[in-house]
Every structure is written in C-alpha cells, then in structure tokens.
Amino acid sequence: MAGVLRSVFQRPPGRLQTVKKGAESLIGTEWIRHKFTRSRIPDKVFQPRPEDHEKYGGDPQNPHKLHIVTRIRSTKRRPYWEKDTIKMLGLQKAHSPQIHKNIPSVNAKLKVVKHLIRIQPLKLPQGLPTEETMSSTCLKSTGELVVQWHLKPVEQEAKS
C-alpha cells in the first residue's frame, strides 16, 4: 500500500488524475460478493398440486375465503426481504394471529415466508358476523370465529 501511495505522489499531476479515474471504477459494486441474493424459485412451486389438497385437507372446488396467519419463528438472521414481507403482513409480533384474504397476491407473499408462519383456514360455523356482532366475536385456536351472543335480561311483569 505504501508503494502505491509513493508512486502516486511522485508522479506529475496529469498522471494523478488517471489514477483517480481508475480508482473510481473500483468503487462500483460489480466485484463485491453480496451476502444475500434473492432465491430463484421456479414457477412450478407456486402452482397448486392435487397432492397438496390430499396432504393438508381442503376442497379445491370450494376453497376457504380467509386465512389465519400466525408467525411462529423469529425473523432474526433472516434476509431483509423476508423481514419486509413479515412487516407488510402485520406479523411483527409472534403468536398473534392476523386474518388475510385467500387471493393470489397475498398467497405469493405468504409463500416467501412460509417457513416462518402457520396458515390455517378461517372457519365460520355461525356465518359472517354483522357490524353489530363484530365486537362480540371470539377467534379460537382451532381457527373458528365464534359469535358470542349477549343474553338480554328478561323483563319481569309487574305483579299486582
């Protein structure tokens, strides 16, 4: 290194500029080995397969409309794009369920972080809740959304 600096300072100013131009070309990132690179996942991985339905259950003719997504593994020491996907899905806190639509754009994001999350179908045994009953719903660990009916007090007739 000292020999390189000595040769730079002993040369005339015109030659110093050519050395600077050569140094600027080394600043580019073409020669750096990047630690993380996006994996090249083939498209056939994202296509539905009949054996998946047999393995995990479910009906391909009538798929469920909503997913319950829960993060079960940490994002420490994971690549930045997985952390960004977890943040987009709202799964920063572990073991807190989030509900997402079963649509291709969301499913593509879930495939990227499928090793960090658990996906369950949302079951609605009592049907979709209305706006009034939304506050009295309970999400069970089995994936059922139960509407808890509030009991109204029975009015007693006045005794005379």
Curated annotation (Swiss-Prot):
Disulfide bonds: none annotated. GO terms for cellular component: mitochondrial large ribosomal subunit; mitochondrion. GO terms for molecular function: structural constituent of ribosome. The keyword Amino-acid biosynthesis does not apply. Keywords: Mitochondrion, Ribonucleoprotein, Ribosomal protein, Transit peptide. The keyword Disulfide bond does not apply. PANTHER family: LARGE RIBOSOMAL SUBUNIT PROTEIN UL30M, MITOCHONDRIAL RIBOSOMAL PROTEIN L30. This is Large ribosomal subunit protein uL30m. It comes from Rattus norvegicus (Rat).
